[in-house]
From Swiss-Prot:
Any one biological process term the GO annotation gives: microtubule-based movement
Recorded name of the encoding gene: KIN7F
Polar residues bias: start-end ranges: 495-512, 560-587
UniProt-recorded Gene Ontology molecular function terms: ATP binding; ATP hydrolysis activity; microtubule binding; microtubule motor activity
Kinesin motor domain boundaries: 34-356
Recorded superkingdom: Eukaryota
Protein name: Kinesin-like protein KIN-7F
Region (Disordered): 484-512, 553-588
Known role: Binds ATP/ADP in vitro. Possesses low ATPase activity but high affinity for microtubules.
Length: 945
């Protein structure tokens, strides 16, 4: 006999009155519930009325009983008590049964053990109450059996009494004491106990009458017919299906219900007992005292010793007291003032009993008939497989193939949805910029850009669709200055057909929102003076980027366009497009042959030769500095106020208007202010630079780090400072290999110029990108055995804000290199870089968290934590089990969130809101890099591993 889940139990119908009889045992674990406690107040007896004994207890509602006067010897004792149900003196036994015992008693028909107790002082109405409840319960059981003829029921009845700590069989004529035995499967049972199979309801009535006659009773001063023993009536019900209806309905349910009528506690001074009555009262009070001790210890939820074996009563009723049974206790009491102390003790017992938790399970037995049928069915299936193995294997392979197709289609559907959402967001951005005017961009017409002239004294507005070639022109015109506002021209209806039209693939076309800017009055002359001097320098820089994006011909064409637009000394005062000059230029281009065009481009390129040499020497001399080294053309422009403003803007985070600037082309992002590299720096590899950084970090950590454990944890400010330093180190490494590695990928974005601005370009895409990067980082953490404290800090700090992209990128690249390092084995120059050493450090950190659980969490909080993390309260080393569960399920984001929350609580981390507010004050723009001490990296060593 064992416990099964509720899905394997036959779901029977509801009883009359809407009571559900299915106990719904929750699988092998069972269903935890408290004991149902009720209090019944009897009316005053004739003797009490004759003595003028007033009533001191009153039921104010269905759940509360109060005392009308206080206890003189105990002024602090409570005067009000609350229970599951309180019955007034005018309530009949049928109402007590329906509201206080029916639901528990009828659980027996669904395979759940149940017990009904009657507890109270002598002459309080226990036997009267239990007699009625027994009759009502048996009547409902037989009524249920009559309504369910599809199952076969077998009822067995047994009865015992405990008189002076001696167990007797009430159904046997012999007065022989019975012995108690313990069995691993049955539990405690009575040896040679008579068990009668019931024929019907009348047969049970006859047996109950025999028990009443056999039970020990006697007359006392308080009661003419007082019970002198504890009586236990046991009704066992076995039910099984009459025919085989399937595997789920082929089990046999076995459960029993106990009707326990306890003898009443009494005082010798009040009962005036002597001789045999005094001896009986001593045994009764002793067994009831043991019962009260067991109830009190069970109510305190402690793992101490429970004295079940101190009394035969508690030993027999052990399954009903906090075991595999549903239990209801009905406490009877007298309202008379003379019994006030005894009534208060009864209420205290009831208060402890309602705190006791039981674990009721469904008891089932697999029938032989059902087991045979199940084995026959399994045998037939195996024989069919042996007869035709080919067909079975082909069917299995077909099912696997279909499953693979389904998974593949689901993956494709997910990718298509992402592409659709991305396309919709891009379309919305384009519609907002373009409005009602549709701008068609043609790459062949891009040469008309040299007809643009600077509007020196006025504000210029230009709306254009930026292509790869126009990006180069923009780079030349901006002279590599970051943060330049893109000028736009708003198209008016009368100017629509005069505008220059470009056509380019849509994936390269990004529109810019309108922005107005002012140029100094001498800007046109100044530009014309420096264009001839340093134009070769500019063309060199343009071709370095454009070679990998558009090819050599497009680069030459774009460079020619940019240089012509700068070299024109006779530019007009306003920035506009001249129809006449435009048409004449187009006709002139049509007339020229390809050879003429190539010669023209070659003539444009020749004047730049000298400036390239200056640029190379300048960049080599400034390779060790942290600030961008400029060519002579750029230095000649820095004296103006415009470029001073640009320098200020470049060293600070973008303002709000620039953050919202979503129309900047992806290949024309604002560049970092430290883009300098020479020929020697190109030899530096990414692995080498990062390896040197880790070496330096470990040297600092050896001198300053302390063992993680009992020391205090770093503050959130220090952790943010660590991330800031990591971002600066990552930026320097990007500069080291930007000359040969990243530019070869074909986009300026790969150089890592401004990932924050890039993430802000499409807000609808950033959440998906953030989730992807976050999942990759979590996987890397798990693979590299990164410190749990580092994971918690990082996870709680960055929650999807677009400004967090630089942090995510730095962490992702660091972890990627760390994983590559581990996969290649330990490095000789850096100790403790193997995966085994990092695993040992992670294990020590988990042990440290175990100690923190003991210090920072109370007993109740720890027990709640064990339950939440699925750790059994009865198991050993529970704190270590919880620590080993932390950050283990990398694919379950809820598990990760709960792990971070628990670790943050254990290490005393600040609120996430405060941490984020401090993070927002940081600026990751490249600045003078001074290596700070590593005192704050107390746990950084674990994070690197």
């Amino acid at each position: 006999m064992g416990a099964i889940g509720g899905d394997e139990v036959v779901q029977w119908d509801k009883m009359d009155g809407g009571e559900v009889v299915n106990g719904g045992g929750g699988g092998g674990v069972g269903k935890l519930e408290r004991i149902l406690v009720s209090v019944r107040l009897r009316p005053l007896s004739d003797k009490e009325i004759a003595r003028g004994d007033p009533s001191e207890w009153e039921c104010i509602n269905d759940t509360t009983i109060i005392s009308r006067s206080t206890f003189p010897d105990r002024p602090s004792a409570p005067t009000a008590y609350s229970f599951d149900r309180v019955f007034r003196s005018d309530c009949d036994t049928n109402e007590v049964y329906k509201q206080g015992a029916k639901e528990v008693a009828l659980s027996v028909v669904s395979g759940i053990n149940s017990s009904i107790f009657a507890y109270g002082q002598t002459s309080s109405g226990k036997t009267y109450t239990m007699t009625g409840i027994t009759e009502y319960t048996v009547a409902d059981i037989y009524d249920y059996i009559g309504k369910h003829e599809e199952r076969a029921f077998v009822l067995k009845f047994s009865a015992i009494e405990i008189y002076n700590e001696v167990v007797r069989d009430l159904l046997s004529a012999e007065n022989t004491p019975l012995r108690l035995w313990d069995d691993a499967e049955k539990g405690t049972y009575v040896e040679n106990l008579t068990e009668v199979v019931l024929r019907d309801w009348n047969h049970l009535k006859e047996l109950i009458s025999v028990c009443e006659a056999q039970r020990k009773t006697g007359e006392t001063y308080l009661n003419e017919n007082s019970s002198r023993s504890h009586q236990i009536l046991k009704l066992t019900i076995e039910s099984s299906a009459r025919e085989f209806l399937g595997k789920d309905k082929s089990t046999t349910l076995v459960a029993s219900v106990n009707f326990v009528d306890l003898a009443g506690s009494e005082r010798a001074s009040q009962a005036l007992s002597a001789g045999a009555r005094l001896k009986e009262g001593c045994h009764i009070n002793r067994s009831l005292l043991t019962l009260g001790t067991v109830i009190r210890k069970l109510s305190k939820v402690r793992n101490g010793h429970i004295p079940y074996r101190d009394s035969k009563l508690t030993r027999i009723l052990q399954p009903s007291l906090g075991g595999n049974a549903r239990t209801a206790i009905i406490c009877t009491m007298s309202p008379a003032r003379s019994h006030m102390e005894q009534s208060r003790n009864t209420l205290l017992f009831a208060s402890c009993a309602k705190e006791v938790v039981t674990n009721a399970q469904v008891n089932v037995v697999m029938s032989d008939k059902a087991l045979v049928k199940q084995l026959q069915k399994e045998l037939a299936r195996l024989e069919s497989e042996l007869r035709c193995p080919a067909s079975y294997s082909s069917l299995e392979s077909l099912v696997k193939e279909k499953d693979n197709q389904i998974r593949k289609m689901e993956k494709e559907i997910k990718e298509l949805k992402l592409q659709r959402d991305l396309a919709q967001s891009r379309l919305q951005d384009l519609l907002q910029v373009v409005g009602d005017n549709h701008v068609h961009v043609s790459k062949q017409s891009s040469v008309s850009g040299r007809n643009f002239t600077f509007d020196v004294p006025q504000t210029c507005e230009d709306e254009q669709s930026t292509t790869e070639s126009s990006e180069v022109v923009d780079s030349v015109q901006n002279f590599r200055f970051q943060g330049r506002r893109v000028a736009q021209r708003e198209h008016k209806p009368q100017q629509a057909e005069n505008n220059v039209q470009f056509t380019t693939p849509s994936r390269y076309s990004v529109s810019s929102p309108p922005f107005s800017g002012m140029l100094p009055t001498n800007r046109s002359d100044h530009l014309s003076q420096i264009s001839n001097e340093d134009s070769d320098d500019i063309c060199k820089e343009v071709r370095c980027i454009e070679t990998n994006e558009t090819g050599g011909n497009e680069c030459l064409e774009s460079s020619a366009v940019g240089s012509n637009s700068l070299q024109d000394p006779n530019a007009g005062s306003s920035m506009h497009i001249n129809n006449d000059s435009n048409s004449s230029m187009n006709s002139r281009l049509r007339d020229e042959s390809p050879v003429t065009l190539e010669q023209h481009l070659e003539n444009v390129r020749k004047p730049f030769a000298n400036i390239v040499k200056d640029l190379g020497s300048s960049t080599r001399n400034s390779s060790s500095s942290k600030v961008l080294g400029r060519s002579r053309s750029c230095r000649s422009l820095t004296g103006s106020s415009l470029f001073e403003d640009l320098e200020k803007d470049d060293c600070t985070p973008p303002n709000r208007s620039f953050i919202d600037f979503a129309g900047r082309p992806q290949n024309c992002q604002r560049r970092g202010s430290a883009l300098n590299y020479d020929a020697e720096s190109e030899t530096l590899s990414r692995a080498g630079s990062m390896l040197s950084e880790i070496t330096t970090t470990r040297d600092g950590l050896k001198a300053n780090s302390s063992v993680a454990g009992d020391t205090e944890f770093t503050g959130i400010g220090e952790f943010v400072a660590e991330l800031k330093e990591m971002a600066q180190v990552q930026y320097q490494k990007q500069l080291g290999h930007s000359g040969n590695g990243d530019l070869a990928e074909g986009t300026i974005r790969s150089v890592g110029l401004d990932p924050i601005t890039d993430a802000l370009q499409s807000p609808s895409r950033w959440p998906l990108e953030f989730e992807k990067k976050q999942q990759e980082i979590i996987d890397f953490w798990h693979a590299c055995n990164v410190s749990l404290v580092h994971r918690t800090y990082f996870f709680l700090l960055f929650k999807g804000d677009p400004a967090d992209s630089i942090y995510m990128e730095v962490e992702l690249r660091r972890l990627s290199f760390l994983k590559d390092t581990y996969s290649n084995g330990a490095i000789a120059s850096i100790p403790n870089t193997s995966l085994v050493s990092s695993a040992k450090k992670l294990q020590r950190e988990r042990e440290m968290l175990c100690r923190q659980m003991q210090r920072r969490l109370s007993i109740e909080e720890r027990e709640s934590m064990y339950t939440k993390w699925g750790v059994s309260l009865a198991s050993k080393r529970r704190r270590l089990q919880v620590a080993r569960c932390l950050w283990t399920e990398t694919k379950d984001l809820e598990h990760v969130r709960e792990s971070a929350s628990l670790v943050a609580r254990l290490i005393g981390l600040l609120e996430p809101g405060k941490a984020l507010r401090e993070m927002f004050g940081l600026s990751f723009a490249p600045q003078q890099f001074t290596r700070r001490s590593y005192n704050s990296w107390r746990y950084g060593r674990s994070s690197l591993n």
